[in-house]
Regions:
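Extreme N-terminal starter segment of soluble prokaryotic enzymes
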Residues: 1-3
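A conserved beta-strand-loop-helix scaffold within acyl/acetyltransferase catalytic domains
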Residues: 5-65, 111-113, 117-118, 127, ...
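C-terminal catalytic domain of photolyase/cryptochrome flavoproteins
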Residues: 15, 33, 41-42, 351-405
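Residue-level signal for secondary-structure boundary elements
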Residues: 25, 100, 189-190, 212, ...
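Acyl-donor binding region in acyl/amide transferases
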Residues: 65-150, 300, 306-367
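Generic secondary-structure boundary/loop-capping signal
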Residues: 73, 157, 167, 376-378
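A general structural signal for short secondary-structure boundary/capping elements
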Residues: 102-104, 203, 234-237, 348-350, ...
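Bacterial peptidoglycan biogenesis and beta-lactam-recognition machinery
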Residues: 209, 341, 371-373
Length: 405
């Protein structure tokens, strides 16, 4: 016999979620601390003494004392158990109604398809079956959009799995650029505290300025690191400006000497030397300016990663575009993913992408041979049926407005 509980112990919830095939950071009890602008509860279903369903519920206050609720990558349960699914949604609807909820939004961690770039996309048959189970439980599927703005969480994620990771799994482009990075005077550091937070925050600001977007601030990154403790880490890569400068300057002076000693009739050789000299002159000037600006070393890129259960999420990544020719991101991301797997993770989520699978972000991430995890999408569970249509319209208008800001 099932029993709905509205105050599940956070520790028991996490133990349950971490063992599930649907384990996801957004369902961790600590995620509520990160989303401090929402209130929250953890609800679930017991069968006897056994927890069989659980979900973090984020609660947003609306005008006139109404609320909306969101189950990020939840609920966690066996979606093949139709009786359990129907009981859960019937019970949570009744519970939410007492809290003046208009509707509940959810985006369960069900994979609609899994494939590599270039492979044929085949829909998982069990996902179709689970979709029918959910619809039978009176939740409304919101379709299969490809863009970012239509859903709270991206439907498409690029994920590297432990059994498909290594230098031999990189694409030709990835292997080449990693090799270039390894030859530069780059030093990658991993920190499970705020030691590298200032440098990480700086490269995130560089990314914001370059793309003309607003991401998060230093306080938010600190909140993530503090909240998840030893399960959150920064990967930062530094360029040794002094070593790089001395190496380039040595090549520059040698090139100058070679030009002086080059016979006048060796026109092709002289042309190549002068081209090299022009390039080295620019590089020397650039490095001189950067040494004045940054000192002996500079952080060129970084990532922020959180581990939960056997999964890991690279939540944020930034780079200083002035140093893109050193290929630091290839080394940084490789070391980040490597650290996740050394910590016992089976997957490393590099983040969401547009469903068109086009653009620079997809091109970069594709070099690590990721699997495309396409999630089943969002569902709505109407709670106040009379006001649901109006609230749904208002929600979509707000999403559209935010999209065009």
């Amino acid at each position: 016999m099932y029993k709905f509980i509205d105050k599940i112990d956070p520790k028991k919830h996490d133990e349950f979620v971490e063992k599930s095939v649907y384990c996801n950071l957004l369902q961790s009890s600590s995620w509520a601390k990160v989303k401090s602008n929402w209130s929250h509860e953890i609800v679930g279903v017991y069968e006897g003494e056994t927890l069989v369903a659980s979900s973090l519920v984020l609660i947003k206050k609306l005008p006139l004392s109404f609320t909306m609720m969101y189950l990020p990558r939840g609920p966690i349960m066996d979606y093949d158990n139709q009786e359990l699914v129907q009981f859960f949604f019937k019970a949570i609807r009744k519970w939410a109604k007492k809290r003046h909820c208009l509707f509940i939004k959810l985006d369960p961690g069900i994979h609609y398809s899994d494939y590599h770039l270039g492979d044929q996309r085949i829909v998982n048959e069990d996902a179709i079956r689970k979709l029918k189970v959910l619809e039978n439980a009176k939740v409304k599927h919101q379709g299969f959009p490809l863009d970012f703005s239509s859903t709270i969480q991206p439907r498409f994620h690029m994920v590297v799995y432990a059994n498909e990771f290594g230098e031999d799994c990189l694409t030709k482009k990835g292997a080449k650029n990693l090799k270039i990075a390894l030859k530069k005077h780059l030093d990658t550091k991993i920190g499970y505290n705020t030691t590298y937070l200032d440098d990480f925050s700086r490269v995130m600001n560089c990314t914001e300025n370059r793309k003309g977007i607003s991401l998060r601030n230093k306080d938010y990154y600190k909140l993530l690191l503090d909240t998840y403790g030893q399960n959150a880490f920064l990967t930062v890569t530094y360029l040794d400006l002094d070593q790089t400068y001395h190496e380039i300057y040595e090549r520059y002076t040698k090139c100058q000497k070679d030009i002086e000693e080059c016979p006048e009739n060796a026109t092709k050789k002289l042309f190549k030397l002068e081209e090299t000299n022009a390039s080295l002159t620019r590089e020397v000037k650039f490095l001189e300016e950067q040494r004045i600006k940054h000192g002996s070393k500079v952080c060129v890129c970084g990532t922020l990663t959180v581990i939960y259960g056997k999964t890991s999420e690279i939540l944020y990544a930034g780079m200083d575009n002035d140093f893109k020719r050193y290929m630091g991101p290839y080394l940084t991301w490789y070391k980040t993913i490597e650290e996740c797997f050394e910590r016992g993770c089976v997957s490393s989520n590099m983040g969401g992408v547009e469903g068109t699978l086009k653009g620079g972000l997809v091109d970069f991430k594709s070099v690590f041979h990721p699997t495309i995890n396409e999630f089943i999408g969002e569902f709505d569970l109407p709670v106040n049926k009379m006001l649901y249509s109006l609230s749904e319209m208002a929600y979509k208008l707000r999403k559209h407005k935010n999209k065009h800001k």
